[in-house]
């Protein structure tokens, strides 16, 4: 008996509380006992992790978290580990007594999400002496050890001979090894299998009836429906060949379409990119060469521009310097012109003011005389007015006094007093103290005489004063003229200086008359000097441009030489233009021809590609279109011959098929109707009786029975006589032989055996001679031999038919290809190669471009020389007329000499202009200056004194006259005399007063009118004096300003200054124009230099980038080319017609192909990954790898039994040809196939009955299991009602639904699903397809429903639900069911693993305290009976009597936490044996 494998131990390394702990596992039950937090769950978690290292499934939770949501739970593994490397290892001894160590390396991953890294591994061949802890750790000293990393563990184990260490990258590989070695009961192929296994472990660990396991008990307990699948296979056995043919057609169809699609799109995708890279490489090379040419050209241009810039900058500097001088000269000339104009305006003002002053002087002298006369007359009028006033006042006083005397008595006294006052006043004024009224007349006469004398003297002095005043005015005028001309001087020197000035004025006038001739001479010389300077400048510029110093004498010869050069260069330039035009025309013609060839090249390449394909297909070379048409006629003849031969082979093949079908009839009947007749007559076919005849005897018996070989042997002929009447459905000749089919022999005939023949005596008069057939068909052996030979011949004919069909279709396709070629390409296919002509044209174009470039350079040089020569001739044309000026070396000295003379003359002219009028005025009054009228002041004093004397005398005479007038007042007589005398006096006084008042009025009027006239004369005099003084001051200022201007203001000065200014302005304008041209040219040159510099930098950068790109791409391109050549796909990828497409068109073509390829390879992971990698534009070789991968993939998919080629492109053609043949074969055999639904229903019923019986057997093992109130456990398996109806219909009423099963559009599964829907219209099928539903209906497990029932107390049999059972009962019930599941898995998987392996059985149970002692004992019995291991976690109050118990106590020592473990053997049957105590170091 095969021993069951066992788990020996569990080892935990670096877990929380366990540094290096090995738990030896009992063969039955291992109990982990300890309080809360002792480490029981951690130990079982380590065991489960080593069994199922799937982080998506592992979830260690407490039982108190049952109601928590999954999102709030911690997976629980991270917290059970310590930092660093951790291990969980299982030590197993399998049924072969092999030691296997399996486990996982765990390590916490830093981060907030508390992840754990798991690596499974396995160790085989490890000696039993090596303990897991010693293997996984390294001892450092007595109290320290180090955990080895996985790499260190591998290196350590490699040192041990015979030990194999395996590390797994997938959990599937890990579980596959565990299944093969008998560690797990079931092969866990997928995540779904792992999930089932984990759910089983989880249900075992936490106890109870898991709803998930209860719902999926069918998946856990019922094996795969191999019986139904076998029935389905048997049911379709008759369809196999047809299915294979159909599958071949479908595969061929899909492969053909896939091949076409993949080949075309992959070729477009890769070839477009390949040719784009080839074009880009060629373009990049051309660009790199072009960049290099442009770089060298730009460098030359930059050097030329720099030289040009230096020359223009130098010339611009000279022009700027010259411009500064010209601007200064022009500004000076402009200022000089302004000064001349200002001086002329000043001179005009001076002349105008001088004339005005002369007029004013005359008017002033005249006005002075008028004012003097008016003043004298005014004084006289004033004297008369004053006398009149005095007389009127006196008369009024007298008359008032007289009137007063008349009015009062004191009048006389008043008059007398007044008389005395008048007398006293006269004494005072006349200085006559002895004056009396009587002597007043005498003194009056004396003083009147004195008054007359003073008046006469005053008049004399006035006359003298007038004469002196005139002489003094003339002297002062002459002195002022001398002072104005010469400046301040002594009055005594005025006459001498005036004489010198007059003599010098004559000389100055003579010099001033020479100004105009000198100026004209100077202008002429200055013009010649300027022309000389201009000629020297032009000569200097010419020499600078010419590059060497040229003598004046050589200028004419040089002029002739330059004219000759111009003529020659002109001819050269004109000839160069014609030559350039001819070259350009030829280049344009080449370009036009090239464009036409470029347009024709793709068409020609397509035609050549088609022609090459035709040549490859037929193996012929075609030189002309006539060869093509001749070969096409040969193809037609060959096609007709092949069709005839194919039809003959097809007819023979069909005959063989019919013969094989006839020979394959049951019992050897050649006619299928014989079997029905034999069954109807109750007989047996003769061929069936002799079915066991050997192959050697077959010819004899075949000849013996002859035509009656197909007879029916019946027990009694008389019984079937009636049945023969009306018999129609039978062969033409039906032989019936009477005899016992069980003991039939050949005694019915009289036979004589001859050499290879027999003579059968049928009757006395009828014999039959039959030779032994060459191919006997009597007996199964003979028929099988014949069928075998027929099959061999049929295979040969099939191959020949396929070959001929292929050849026919190939010929037809070749004919179609020739027809398409003739219709599309024959017109251009045999024309010359346009690409060769394009290459020749490109070579010629390059030569032309180089010739044009060289010609342009030469022409440019000639143009430059031509322009230089023209400029030189133009410069010489301006210089040659001035050669005499260039030779005149004394011109500048003569200009200086004339300039000095002109300066002197201009100075004289300015003197004459300034003082000419003054000298003219001085000349007639020169004699006045000889004597100085110094007595004029004394005369003025005498005149004033005489005026005062005359005024005093007049007052004295008036006073005396008043006394004389009042002399009567000194003696009055009586009042009568006084009244009469006063009356006369009053009248006289009144008359006199009237006369005096009239005189006074007249004198007043005269005084007023004369005063007004005098005032007017004074105002006119003041105005004239003011105007004279103002204009004299202005004239002085103007003369000073004119002197300050310092410019000679003659008549031609302004014209000369303007001409000079205009000349300088013209020169300055020309200079500025040249400077602007130079600045613009310099700016353009700098811009051109900047552009050239930027362009040069850009070209250098582009050239280096392009060169680097070319060099970089060269390596990649070499790799691509090497890969292309090594893979042999260059012919497919190098599509020359694509070279004429643009990069965008090729990229678009590649992108479109890529878009079509993505869905095409979506189902192929390898091609999808390679395609995704090929999308990297930086790795073009990956596209080649993708193309090679597509070719390799297609080669692998070529069915060699159908298509005999390795080339996918050829395979496409063969597929299309083979498709027709397979379709015909399918059509011919489709009618002979049939399907039986009754057999399928019977097999499903039998499978259901077998599984129900197996479940009943399992229930017998569960009937003795009891937990608490649960007395027994069982499983109920029932068939669903809807599915039972389906089985009944399939077996009994299938004829009613043949429309489904006979449909060519439905598979059997789909027909089954349609039938199920037809029978159960009330059931909602959801989104599932009929194929899916039909496949489910072929699985017998879907016909069954399964539930768990318990016999509990007085309730009897109940459905096992967690609500109806206690916790302990649920745990026990669940454990029982899980044991059944494990046992069922082992039975199911026994055929998959080795026969000598019995897998390990192990389950878990956490919180076993919920089970009573009886339940636990039952679990022990269950483990013992089933050979199962069980790990139980229980609190300290549970102490099983059997198995091994570990006491776990978690302790803290020096801030270090570890679990103290004590192991005990079971103590019920024997004294307890204590295991050595072990404490873990942490």
Swiss-Prot record:
UniProt-annotated binding residues for ATP: 34-41
Q: Which Pfam families does the protein's record reference?
A: MukB, MukB_hinge, SbcC_Walker_B
Coiled-coil region: 326-416, 509-603, 780-805, 835-923, 979-1116, 1210-1265
Coarse class of the primary localization is cytoplasm
> Could you tell me where this protein is found in the cell?
Cytoplasm, Nucleoid
Functionally, this protein is described as follows: Plays a central role in chromosome condensation, segregation and cell cycle progression. Functions as a homodimer, which is essential for chromosome partition. Involved in negative DNA supercoiling in vivo, and by this means organize and compact chromosomes. May achieve or facilitate chromosome segregation by condensation DNA from both sides of a centrally located replisome during cell division.
Q: How does it assemble?
A: Homodimerization via its hinge domain. Binds to DNA via its C-terminal region. Interacts, and probably forms a ternary complex, with MukE and MukF via its C-terminal region. The complex formation is stimulated by calcium or magnesium. Interacts with tubulin-related protein FtsZ.
Name of this chain's protein: Chromosome partition protein MukB
Q: What is the lineage of its organism?
A: Bacteria, Pseudomonadati, Pseudomonadota, Gammaproteobacteria, Enterobacterales
- The gene designation is mukB
């Amino acid at each position: 008996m095969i021993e069951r494998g066992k788990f020996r131990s569990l080892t935990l390394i670096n877990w929380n509380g366990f540094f290096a702990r090995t738990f030896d596992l009992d063969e039955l039950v291992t109990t982990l006992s300890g309080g809360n937090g002792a480490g029981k769950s951690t130990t079982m978690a380590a065991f489960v992790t080593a069994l199922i290292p799937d982080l998506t499934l592992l979830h260690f939770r407490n039982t108190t978290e049952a109601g928590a949501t999954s999102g709030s739970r911690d997976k629980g593994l991270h917290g059970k580990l310590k930092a660093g490397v951790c291990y969980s290892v299982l030590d197993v001894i399998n049924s072969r007594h092999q030691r296997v160590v399996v486990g996982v390396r765990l390590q916490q991953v830093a981060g907030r999400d508390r992840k754990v890294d798991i690596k499974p591994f396995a160790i085989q061949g490890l000696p039993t002496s090596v303990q897991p802890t010693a293997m996984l750790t390294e001892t450092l000293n007595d109290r320290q050890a180090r955990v080895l990393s996985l790499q260190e563990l591998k290196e350590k184990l490699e040192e041990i001979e015979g030990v194999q260490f395996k590390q797994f990258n997938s959990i599937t590989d890990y579980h596959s090894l565990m299944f093969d070695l008998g560690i797990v009961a079931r092969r866990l192929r997928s995540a779904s299998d792992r999930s089932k296994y984990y759910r089983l472990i989880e249900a075992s660990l936490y106890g109870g009836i898991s709803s998930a396991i209860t719902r999926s008990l069918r998946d856990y307990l019922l094996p795969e429906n191999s019986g139904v699948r076998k029935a389905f296979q048997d049911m379709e056995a008759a369809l196999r060949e047809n299915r294979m043919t159909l599958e071949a057609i479908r595969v061929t169809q899909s492969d053909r379409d896939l091949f076409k699609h993949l080949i075309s799109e992959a070729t477009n995708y890769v070839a477009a990119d390949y040719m784009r890279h080839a074009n880009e490489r060629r373009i990049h090379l051309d660009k790199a060469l072009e960049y290099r040419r442009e770089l060298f050209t730009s460098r030359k241009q930059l050097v030329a521009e720099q030289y040009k810039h230096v020359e223009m900058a130098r010339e611009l500097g000279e022009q700027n310097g010259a411009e500064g001088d010209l601007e200064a000269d022009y500004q000076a000339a402009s200022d000089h012109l302004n000064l001349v104009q200002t001086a002329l305006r000043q001179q005009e003002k001076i002349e105008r003011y001088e004339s005005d002053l002369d007029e004013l002087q005359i008017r002033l002298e005249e006005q002075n005389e008028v004012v003097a006369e008016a003043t004298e007359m005014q004084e006289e009028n004033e004297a008369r007015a004053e006398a009149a006033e005095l007389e009127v006042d006196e008369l009024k006083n007298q008359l008032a006094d007289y009137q007063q005397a008349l009015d009062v008595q004191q009048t006389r006294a008043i008059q007398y007093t007044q008389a005395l006052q008048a007398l006293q006043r006269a004494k005072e004024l006349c200085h006559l103290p002895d004056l009396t009224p009587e002597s007043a007349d005498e003194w009056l006469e004396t003083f009147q005489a004195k008054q007359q004398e003073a008046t006469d003297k005053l008049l004399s002095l006035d006359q003298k004063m007038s004469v002196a005043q005139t002489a003094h005015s003339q002297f002062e005028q002459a002195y002022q003229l001398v002072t104005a001309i010469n400046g301040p001087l002594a009055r005594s020197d005025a006459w001498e200086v005036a004489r010198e000035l007059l003599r010098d004025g004559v000389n100055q006038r003579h010099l001033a008359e020479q100004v105009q001739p000198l100026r004209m001479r100077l202008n002429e010389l200055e013009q010649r000097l300027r022309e000389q300077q201009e000629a020297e400048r032009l000569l200097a510029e010419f020499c600078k441009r010419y590059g060497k110093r040229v003598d004046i004498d050589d200028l004419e010869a040089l002029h002739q030489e330059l004219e000759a050069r111009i003529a020659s260069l002109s001819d050269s330039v004109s000839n160069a233009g014609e030559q350039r035009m001819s070259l350009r025309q030829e280049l344009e013609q080449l370009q036009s021809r090239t464009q036409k060839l470029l347009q024709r090249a793709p068409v020609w390449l397509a035609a050549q590609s088609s022609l090459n394909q035709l040549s490859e297909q037929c193996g012929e070379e075609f030189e002309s279109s006539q060869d093509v048409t001749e070969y096409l006629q040969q193809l037609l003849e060959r096609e007709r011959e092949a069709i005839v031969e194919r039809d003959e082979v097809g007819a023979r093949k069909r005959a063989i098929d019919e013969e094989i079908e006839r020979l394959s009839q049951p019992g050897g009947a050649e006619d299928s109707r014989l079997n029905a007749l034999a069954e109807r007559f109750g007989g047996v076919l003769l061929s069936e009786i002799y079915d066991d005849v050997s192959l050697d005897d077959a010819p004899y018996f075949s000849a013996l029975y002859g035509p009656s070989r197909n007879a029916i042997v019946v027990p009694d002929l008389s019984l079937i006589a009636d049945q023969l009447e009306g018999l129609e459905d039978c062969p033409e000749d039906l032989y019936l032989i009477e005899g016992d089919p069980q003991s039939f022999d050949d005694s019915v005939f009289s036979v004589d055996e001859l050499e290879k023949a027999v003579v059968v005596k049928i009757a006395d008069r009828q014999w039959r001679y039959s030779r032994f057939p060459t191919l006997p068909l009597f007996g199964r052996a003979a028929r099988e031999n014949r069928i075998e030979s027929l099959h061999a011949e049929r295979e040969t004919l099939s191959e020949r038919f396929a070959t001929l069909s292929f050849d026919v279709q190939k010929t037809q396709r070749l004919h179609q290809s020739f027809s398409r070629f003739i219709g599309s390409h024959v017109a251009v296919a045999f024309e010359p190669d346009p690409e060769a002509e394009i290459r020749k044209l490109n070579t010629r174009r390059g030569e032309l471009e180089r010739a044009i470039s060289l010609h342009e350079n030469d022409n440019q040089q000639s143009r430059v020389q031509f322009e230089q020569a023209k400029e030189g001739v133009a410069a010489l044309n301006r210089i040659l007329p001035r050669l005499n000026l260039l030779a005149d070396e004394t011109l500048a000295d003569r200009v200086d000499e004339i300039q000095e003379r002109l300066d002197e003359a201009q100075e004289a002219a300015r003197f004459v202009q300034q003082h000419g009028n003054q000298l003219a005025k001085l000349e007639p009054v020169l004699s006045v200056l000889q004597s100085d009228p110094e007595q004029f002041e004394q005369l003025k004093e005498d005149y004033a004194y005489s005026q005062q004397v005359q005024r005093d005398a007049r007052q004295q005479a008036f006073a005396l006259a008043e006394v004389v007038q009042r002399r009567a007042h000194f003696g009055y007589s009586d009042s009568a005399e006084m009244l009469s005398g006063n009356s006369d006096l009053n009248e006289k006084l009144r008359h006199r007063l009237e006369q005096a008042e009239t005189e006074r009025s007249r004198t007043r009027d005269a005084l007023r009118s004369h005063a007004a006239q005098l005032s007017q004369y004074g105002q006119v005099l003041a105005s004239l004096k003011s105007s004279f003084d103002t204009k004299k001051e202005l004239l002085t200022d103007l003369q000073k300003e004119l002197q300050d201007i310092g410019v000679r203001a003659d008549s031609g000065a302004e014209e000369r200054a303007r001409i000079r200014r205009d000349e300088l302005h013209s020169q300055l304008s020309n200079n500025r124009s040249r400077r602007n041209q130079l600045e613009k040219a310099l700016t353009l040159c700098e811009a051109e230099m900047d552009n050239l510099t930027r362009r040069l930098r850009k070209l250098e950068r582009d050239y280096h980038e392009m060169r680097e790109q070319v060099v970089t791409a060269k390596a990649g391109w070499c790799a691509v080319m090497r890969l292309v050549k090594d893979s042999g796909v260059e012919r497919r990828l190098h599509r020359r017609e694509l070279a004429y497409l643009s990069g965008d068109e090729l990229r678009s073509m590649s992108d479109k192909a890529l878009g079509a390829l993505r869905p095409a390879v979506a189902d192929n992971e390898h091609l999808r990954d390679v395609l995704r990698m090929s999308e990297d534009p930086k790795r073009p070789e990956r596209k080649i790898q993708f193309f090679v991968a597509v070719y390799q993939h297609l080669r692998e998919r070529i069915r060699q039994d159908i298509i005999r080629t390795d080339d996918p492109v050829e395979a496409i053609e063969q597929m299309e040809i083979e498709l027709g043949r397979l379709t015909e074969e399918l059509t011919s055999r489709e009618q002979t196939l049939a399907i039986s639904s009754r057999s399928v229903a019977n097999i499903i019923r039998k499978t259901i009955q077998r599984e129900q019986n197996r479940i009943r057997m399992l229930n017998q093992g569960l009937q003795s299991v009891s937990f608490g109130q649960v007395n027994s456990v069982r499983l109920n398996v029932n068939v669903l009602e809807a599915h039972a109806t389906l089985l009944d219909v399939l077996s009994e009423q299938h004829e009613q639904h043949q429309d489904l099963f006979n449909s060519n559009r439905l598979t059997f599964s789909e027909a089954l699903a349609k039938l199920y829907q037809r029978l159960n219209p009330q059931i909602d099928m959801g989104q599932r397809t009929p194929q899916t539903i039909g496949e489910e209906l072929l699985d017998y497990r879907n016909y069954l429903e399964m539930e768990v029932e318990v016999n509990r107390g007085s309730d009897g049999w109940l459905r096992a639900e967690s609500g109806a059972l206690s916790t302990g009962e649920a745990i026990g019930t669940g454990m029982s069911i899980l044991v059944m599941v494990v046992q069922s898995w082992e039975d199911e998987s026994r055929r998959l693993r080795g026969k000598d392996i019995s897998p390990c059985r192990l389950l878990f149970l956490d919180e076993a305290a919920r089970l009573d002692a009886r339940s636990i004992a039952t679990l022990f019995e269950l483990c013992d009976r089933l050979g199962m291991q069980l790990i139980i976690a229980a609190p300290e109050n549970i102490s099983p009597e059997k198995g091994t118990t570990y006491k776990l106590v978690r302790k803290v020592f020096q801030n270090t936490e570890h679990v103290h473990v004590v192991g005990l053997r079971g103590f019920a049957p024997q004294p307890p044996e204590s295991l050595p105590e072990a404490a873990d170091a942490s």
